């Protein structure tokens, strides 16, 4: 059984929890099953890139983006394109550059025998269609400005 701690009054809004084993196709199929099992489903939250994008693909294929909100964790070029086309309403993005910088900095301190922090929260950012092209968010989504197209997302 999964834990619902920290959700407060929202815990009863969760109708199911499924695991895709970090596989896009499995997430896609599980999402199709959830949409069939729960015809009044209002939202799907994916907790990593695979579950998020797989779910978004299934919602898009079912043309259910106006009925089911999709939010996720982690970003990719495909996730950004799915957000541009109204499939994702939000994605939580890690601050990877800061994570790497702080990780190296603390490792150097450790190797020098200096005091270092063992646990550091490098932060994350909620990205939405409204803020995705602000300067700060673009740096998180496109750190090296490489963009690959993932098929025709308009159909």
Whereabouts are the PLM-identified features?
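Short, small-residue-biased leader/transition segments that mark boundaries at the very start
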Residues: 1-2
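Short beta-strand elements at the ligand-binding edges of bilobed clamshell
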Residues: 85-97
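Conserved beta-strand scaffold positions in the cores of enzyme catalytic domains, especially
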Residues: 14-17, 70, 91, 126
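Alpha-helical scaffold segments in soluble metabolic enzymes
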Residues: 54, 82, 102, 106
């Amino acid at each position: 059984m999964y834990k619902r701690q920290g959700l407060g009054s929202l815990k009863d809004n969760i109708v199911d929890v499924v695991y895709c084993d970090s596989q896009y196709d499995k997430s896609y199929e599980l999402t199709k099953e959830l949409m069939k099992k729960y015809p009044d489903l209002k939202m799907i939250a994916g907790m990593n890139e695979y579950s998020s994008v797989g779910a978004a693909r299934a919602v898009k294929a079912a043309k259910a983006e106006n009925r089911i909100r999709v939010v996720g964790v982690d970003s990719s070029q495909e996730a950004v394109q799915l957000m541009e086309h109204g499939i994702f309403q939000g994605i939580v993005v890690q601050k990877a550059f800061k994570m790497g910088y702080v990780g190296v900095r603390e490792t150097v301190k450790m190797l020098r025998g200096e005091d270092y922090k063992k646990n550091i929260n490098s932060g994350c950012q909620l990205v939405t269609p409204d803020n995705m092209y602000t300067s700060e968010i673009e740096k998180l989504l496109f750190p090296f400005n490489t963009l690959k197209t993932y098929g025709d997302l308009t159909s």
